[in-house]
Amino acid sequence: MTSTSPTNPAAASSTAARTSAPPTTAKPSPTPTPTAIPPVSAQAKAAGLVDVRTVVPDAVIDLRYATTNNFTKTQLYPANARCQIHNSMAAGLKTAADALRRQGLVIVFWDCYRPHAVQVQMFQIVPNPDWVARPTNYARSHESARSVDVTLARAVTGGSCPVAMRIQNHCQLDMGTGFDDFTPRAFAFATNDVSTAAQSNRALLRHAMNTGGITVYEGEWWHFDGPGSDYGRPILDVPVN
């Protein structure tokens, strides 16, 4: 849930066991046929933002902050919020999605561009910088649309997926924790109380994202930063929908 990723000393201790992406024999998914995506707002276009579906047409969009299914238990985005990214992330996300598609997997997007006002609201709800990044006078990470929160899923086959793991005809992979988990198990390279299967799935996600030049934030296995995400920029005035 970070925007400017907060310092978390415990995250560093979890980096010892860094596993390589495991081989997979899953049947590749067909390349999706692009569908017409409504243009982003004039403000978003001027800021260099694009709808992620224009570069990852099979993206599964599950923006948690557009619902109450998030750590604040409050709906922070309008229901029609879109996953918008800065165009500097587009090529990298396409590369990652292409690699995962060959393994029968798709990317599920939990958060993308996050308005500054929402970051302020988050910190007001949970004023703990170990959990939520303290807002500043500059836009970084999610606030600059250069970070995404993601997981992996594959197409559901029959009744093989637990109901809690289903999302839009897909089944999410076991990653060891859910989104916005505030325990040490959420650290990207955690091994304690994280199954071998979940560690392998995290490694698979990291490897694919790394091929696109997108790197994990070690404090949260789901948070990935694009080029220049940590550079402070003017705060955007862009609607999330």
PLM feature spans:
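Extracytoplasmic cell-surface/polysaccharide-interacting catalytic and binding patches
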Residues: 2, 7-12, 16-110, 124-219, ...
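Short, well-ordered surface patches within globular domains
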Residues: 118-119
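Segments that shape or occlude catalytic/ligand-binding pockets
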Residues: 115
